[in-house]
Amino acid sequence: MEAKKVTEEEEETWRREIVTSVMRLVSTRLPQTDLISLLLVSPWLYRTLISYPSIWLTINLREMTNAGDRLLAALSLPRYRQVKHINLEFAQGVVDSHLKLVKTECPDALLSLEWLNLNVCQKISDNGIEAITSICPKLKVFSIYWNVRVTDAGIRNLVKNCRHITDLNLSGCKSLTDKSMQLVAESYPDLESLNITRCVKITDDGLLQVLQKCFSLQTLNLYALSGFTDKAYMKISLLADLRFLDICGAQNISDEGIGHIAKCNKLESLNLTWCVRITDAGVNTIANSCTSLEFLSLFGIVGVTDRCLETLSQTCSTTLTTLDVNGCTGIKRRSREELLQMFPRLTCFKVHS
């Protein structure tokens, strides 16, 4: 009888200490869907998991259906009161009315939110942005990729409600104009990352607003914006901490503009795909100044030759891991073997398919 009691006590100790410790470790590595499933296994496991607030800091509804209703249901639960990340990317069934209900029914639920992804939630408009951002005072990262309903009014609401944004993705928001860039520039001097890919209504003047005020930028994505000119590109030189720059499709940039970009000597990733006016002179300037480059795409630039690669090999051979010279008809030494002779650390030779 005594032995049986000892065994039961050992089992209880094992359950309370060992299993609890294991669950604490394992739970931090499980997808949210698995965590929710584990809640249903037993009351003890439910209580154990609920007692770990650090595993309930994210609500991930990516690609889910009925996402608006799911979001409301999640935010009504006490375990999500300290949520910091919400991912609604490609989610279906989330509209302005859901975000307005979050504001009215769960006004304190997002006080700790720092990261909000609304990518491709195309039924959300300026009104939805106003509702959700009005209760997210600590928001730092906001992404609303490919939403054509968002206008300058939505960005006005964002900058009014969220004063601490450091990472902003507006890629594909084609209705935005220079006014949005003015609002961003005036409100976010500490902005570190900005993506305005395919925001085709933004002109040199709008970009200049950002470049002349957001000096902390480390990542700048200007992909598929062919309307900018050297007038704006030259001011990129003001971004002393810039690490990533994508100007794919910048048909108006010249070697002079590239020369100013080369002053950003901390650059690690530079996409010059289809920058068709660039010649060896521009690439040589980059090579001589940006000696930490790890990624460089010259795809489709017919004005560059083997000479620029020779210069690059003298300054960036120990850093470059990705180099795309496909479509550069002036470069003759572009086989895999020849490129590896000049850049032995290359692991990727093709960025564009």
Swiss-Prot record:
InterPro entries: Leu-rich_rpt (IPR001611), Leu-rich_rpt_Cys-con_subtyp (IPR006553), LRR_dom_sf (IPR032675). This is F-box protein At3g58530. Transmembrane segments: none annotated. Pfam families: LRR_6. Residues 8-56 form the F-box domain.
